[in-house]
Regions:
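Active-site HxH/HxHxD metal-binding segment of metal-dependent hydrolases
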Residues: 2-82
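Surface-exposed alpha-helical segments enriched in charged/polar residues
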Residues: 3, 143-146, 240
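Histidine-centered active-site/metal-ligand motif
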Residues: 18-23, 95, 99, 157, ...
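Soluble or luminal CAZymes and related metallo-dependent hydrolases
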Residues: 72, 133-137, 230, 234
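Residue-level marker for the onset of beta-strands and adjacent loop->beta junctions
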Residues: 76-78, 98-100, 244
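Metallo-beta-lactamase
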Residues: 86-183
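C-terminal regulatory/interaction regions
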Residues: 187-259
């Protein structure tokens, strides 16, 4: 995919917004293929240098990423040139407490990572892990970003989008829902993590699905902390709701990820 997008051009730098596996999982392969410089948010230095799988949320979420070493760090408040434009690095804690977004005021473009999507934002993991007041930080991040003149957002997931005011309305509404109902956030997070783990696994025997879910430390811990559902009830509800939205498919005794 990257080779096709480059169309013969060199890849000289790889700049991350945050450290979750779906954003850093290709770093090692791209470094090997293109010998590009890897730049990460400054707050991630120790976690990446020591390859702390708990801090990187690899082990807790049942996810994988090939180990890599970064070449340089980027701190909030600094500027970096990308694509002939100067971008401001902005601290956007919430989904990831060390995350950065990148903003170009001349073209009014925001590279938001998972701090803002067209319909919401990434799971607020710190709130659920008891590490920080993630929802308060997410609210403050949205308030800060909403004050910027923005015409186009390039999110960490989904297509670039305009109509930014509507996206902020949806995001604020969602963060308020979660603040008023932490159990809703907890359940949403469990489903997201199981869906993501299944995208990597691709298929699993239906009979093995309970052990698969209960092998995800995050799902078990969040259920115990916020929901207190019996394990069999949690597994059955996850399966039922993911099948309902076509995030899973049951076929020939197997549960299959889409695609």
């Amino acid at each position: 995919l990257v080779h096709h997008a480059l169309d013969g051009r060199p890849l000289t730098r790889l700049i991350n917004t945050h450290s979750h596996s779906d954003h850093i999982g290709g770093n090692a392969a791209l470094k090997a293929a293109y010998d590009c410089e890897i730049i990460v948010p400054a707050g991630l230095h120790a976690a990446i240098a020591d390859w702390d799988e708990d801090a990187l949320l690899l082990s807790p979420l049942g996810q994988q990423s090939a180990r890599f070493q970064h070449d340089s760090l980027l701190g909030a408040g600094t500027e970096i040139e990308m694509g002939g434009l100067n971008w401001q690095a902005l601290a956007v804690p919430g989904h990831d407490m060390e995350a950065l977004a990148y903003y170009n005021p001349e073209q009014r473009i925001l590279i938001s990572g998972d701090a803002l999507w067209e319909n919401g934002f990434g799971v607020i993991f710190p709130e659920l892990l008891g590490e920080a007041d993630g929802l308060t930080h997410a609210q403050a991040t949205l308030e800060m970003l909403s004050r910027l003149p923005i015409d186009i957002v390039i999110p960490g997931h989904g297509r670039p989008f305009g109509e930014v005011d509507l996206a902020f309305e949806r995001a604020f509404r969602r963060v308020n829902q979660f603040r008023n109902n932490i159990e809703q956030l907890a359940w949403h997070a469990i489903k997201v993590i199981v869906s993501f783990a299944m995208l990597e696994r691709r298929s699993i025997a239906h009979a093995d699905f309970p052990d698969f879910i209960l092998g995800l430390p995050f799902a078990v811990d969040v259920n115990a902390r916020f929901l207190d559902m019996p394990h069999d009830a949690m597994v059955a509800r996850v399966e039922r709701e993911l099948l309902l939205v076509n995030a899973l498919k049951l076929q020939d005794g197997k549960l299959l990820a889409p695609g």
